[in-house]
Amino acid sequence: MTARAEVPPRGSPGAGQAPGSVAVRHALLRWSVLASAVAVWQLAARAHGSVYFPPPVDIARHAVDLWFSGPARHVFLTEEAVGNILPSLGRMAAGFGIAAAAGIALGIAIGRSRRVYALCDPVLQFARAVPPPALVPVFVVLLDFGTPMQIASIVLSAVWPVLINTAEGARDTDPLRIEVAAVLRLTPLERLRFLILPSALPRIFAGLRLSLSLSLILMVFSELLPGTANGIGFTLTDAQSRSDLLTVWAALVLLGALGHLLNTGLLAVEKRLVGRGRTTPP
């Protein structure tokens, strides 16, 4: 018996096209939509002439002058970028890293025990329902203003999506595979490496992406508070107090670009570890 290759029906998406060409077409389509939106923004801003709605070209030029016109030995970063962008990214990276590590470890421990999961689930659902910015005043009282308060706010807000998704992913491990692992006498570490983690990875990355967004939001929110000395959020409030609308818009565009780049990088890691066929939808 010979195997027959399945041919996509005529007119179906991707029929007769290489996967690479389809991916290129999708990328071009996404970028064309973005370019069209920027062009409409530019034309509308020029036509309206409002100081509150500057053209994107002016915003981009101001952002380059403000943050990316430094010397080559500093990777073209200005003192303003080193003093505000890098501290924000450092706090966000620390908070997200702690939240991810704690969430994955606790999630696997909770998810592998039905009894522990049943006991902890109400607490987890309650904690997840609390709006993250509402936690910031609590940490201001406990830790006062400063970097420890900002990192703690990020950690306690970003840990829940990772923890809950990891626990649910660990629970979804095929029981038959667990039984086979017991027959083969795999050690707990081998079960974790070869059974539980591969099964939970799609859910883990779904939680990581939610936590990454929350980390960015809490990073900015905690920097908007009085007593903050640097950061992108500080740049926003300082520019607003001086009615420097170009800097306000530049900071907003910078935050959007950072969020997109970080999410794209995490998606690339997910595809590498999980496989194209098991990635979570964007």
Model-derived segments and spans:
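Transmembrane alpha-helical segments of polytopic membrane transport and secretion proteins
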Residues: M1-A35, T264-P282
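Periplasmic/extracellular loop-to-transmembrane helix junction in inner-membrane transport proteins
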Residues: A47-G97
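Alpha-helical membrane-interface segments at transmembrane helix boundaries
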Residues: V82-G90, Y117, L124-A127, D144, ...
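Transmembrane-helix boundary motif in ABC transporter permease subunits
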Residues: A94-L124
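Generic hydrophobic transmembrane alpha-helix motif, especially the helices
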Residues: Q125-P161, E168-G169
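Glycine-rich helix-loop "coupling/hinge" segments at transmembrane-helix boundaries
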Residues: V141, A170, I217-L255, V274, ...
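Transmembrane alpha-helices
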Residues: A152, L156, P188-F221, W249-A250, ...
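Short cytoplasmic-facing helical segments at TM-TM junctions of multi-pass membrane proteins
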Residues: V162-I204, L236
